[in-house]
Amino acid sequence: MAKFIMVVGTSSNSGKTVLVSGICRMLSNKGYKVAPFKSQNMSLNSRVSIEDGEIAVAQYTQAMAARAEPSVHFNPILLKPKGNFISQVIVHGTPYEDRDYNEYRSNKDDMLEKIKESIDYLDTNYDYVVIEGAGSCCEINLLKDDIANLRIAEISGADAILVSDIDRGGVFAAIYGTVQLLPENWRKLLKGFVINKFRGNIDVLKDGFEKIEELTNIPVIGTIPYDETLILPEEDSQALEGKRVFGNLKSPIEVNIVKFSKIANFTDVDPLSSDCLMRYLDFNDDITGDILILPGTRCSTVEMDLMKKHGMDKKIMEFIERGGIILGICGGYQTLGKMLIDENFSEGDVGTISGLGLFDMETTFGNKKAIKNSTGKISIFDQNFDVAGYELHEGYSVSNETPLISLSRGFGNCGNSYDGSFKVVGNSYIFGTYFHGILENFEFRNYLVNIVNNRKNLSKIENDNYAEIFNKNMDKLSKLIEESLDLSKIIK
C-alpha cells in the first residue's frame, strides 16, 4: 500500500504544483516508486499519457519529476474550458462530454467514483502518492462540491501540508483564515504549514511562526526561499498575464509568439528560450522577430477571426514577403490553410472561416479527437532526423503541400501516414505540424534556429539540452525543498 501526502494551498499560485514536483523528485532520488496525483484539474495545457489519454501538463511534468510513466490515473478528471461557462470533461484521458458548471456540480458523485478508481490503482502500484490540491482549499461557497482538495485527503488517508505564498503579503492571515474556515474533520488532516517564496532573513518570521502554531496547534515545517534561478515549466495560461518578453534577452535572434485568446500548450515554445529572445504579440502588435510561432489554441476559428479583425493576417503576409520563418503548431497550423470548416460550430460562434492561405489545405472540425503519442521522420532538403511529439486535435486536415513528417506512429493530418506541411515561399520558410512538443526534438529546434544563424552569419547551435535542463532544475528544486522543510513526520 502507498503512503499518500497532499499539498493544498491558501490560494491559487501559492506553490502547490512546484512543491509536489519537488517532493516527487526528492522521493524518487531516495529510490521510491512515486506518483503525482490531482483528482481534478482545469487547464487548456495538456499532454498525452502512456495510455494515449489526455492529462494536464502539470501532472505530466510532475510525472517526469517522479521518473514515472505519465498515466491517466495521475489526473483522472481534466476540465478544458470552451467558453460560456462550458467545459469539455476528460475522464481517464478520454473526452466524456461537454458540461456547464451546474450540470457538472450536480453529477460530482459520478466523477468522485472515477477519482476513487484512480486512487485505488495508485495505492496498489506505488510506494508514495503526492497529491496536489486546487486553488484555495477553503472556498466556503464551494466546499460541499469540492472534489479536488481535502475531501481527497480524507478518502486516501493522506497527511496534508498547507502552503502559502509570502510574496503576496498577508501570509499568516491567509494561513489562519484558511484553517478557521475549514470543517473540523478536514482541519485535522493538516500536519504542517509551508511558507513559500521568502526573501531575506528568516529570523523576522520567528514570532509569526510561534503565534500561528499557538493559534492553530499546527507546526510551520519550513520556509522555501525564493530562487529566481530555477527554470520550471508554467502550469497554465494565467502565467502569461503581463508576460511579454522572456528567454535569452541578449540573443540576436528574436522569436515572436501570437498570444491567442484561448492559447493552449504554450509551453511548446519553451525549448527555444535558452537560445532566443522570446516575445508574445497581441493581435494588433507588429511582427518584429525572425521567427513567428502560431501556437496551439482551443478555438482555431475564433483566433483566425481575431487575426483578421486586428490586421494580424496582413502583417503575417508582410512578414512572409520579408523572408520570415513561420511555425504553426496544432491550432496555429490549422490557421495556415485555406479553409477552416466548422459547420456545426464545434469550435465556437465563428463557424466556417477562410484561413491565411499559406498552405493549400482545408481543415474540418467536429471529428473524434485525436489523442496520440506520435513519432516520425522529417526529411527536408539535406535534413533527415527522427522526431516525437503528442497530438490533441479535433480538426482533420487535408493538405496538398509537402508533408513535414512521415509518421511511424500517430494520426497526423487526417489519419494517413503524414503529419504537417512544409513550404518555401521566396526566402520564407513555412512549417506546420500537429505535433505538440516538436521543439523538444533538438535536431528540429536547432535546424529552425540555424536558418536564422546562417542569415546573420552567427555560429550554429548544436544544443540537445532541454531534458538535461529540466532534470538539473528538478534536482535543484528537490535539494532546496529537502534543505528547507522538515518532512520527517509526514514522510515516514
Swiss-Prot record:
Keywords: Cobalamin biosynthesis, Glutamine amidotransferase. Disulfide bonds: none annotated. Transmembrane segments: none annotated. The keyword RNA-binding does not apply. GO terms for molecular function: ABC-type vitamin B12 transporter activity; catalytic activity. It comes from the Archaea. Residues 252-444 form the GATase cobBQ-type domain. InterPro entries: Class_I_gatase-like (IPR029062), CobQ/CobB/MinD/ParA_Nub-bd_dom (IPR002586), CobQ_GATase1 (IPR033949), CobQ_N (IPR047045), CobQ_synth (IPR004459), GATase_3 (IPR011698), P-loop_NTPase (IPR027417). One of its GO terms (biological process) is cobalamin biosynthetic process. The active site is at 330 (nucleophile), 436. Pathway: Cofactor biosynthesis; adenosylcobalamin biosynthesis. Gene3D superfamilies: 3.40.50.880, P-loop containing nucleotide triphosphate hydrolases. Signal peptide: none annotated. Catalyzes amidations at positions B, D, E, and G on adenosylcobyrinic A,C-diamide. NH(2) groups are provided by glutamine, and one molecule of ATP is hydrogenolyzed for each amidation. HAMAP family: CobQ. Belongs to the CobB/CobQ family. CobQ subfamily. This is Probable cobyric acid synthase. It comes from Methanococcus maripaludis (strain C7 / ATCC BAA-1331).
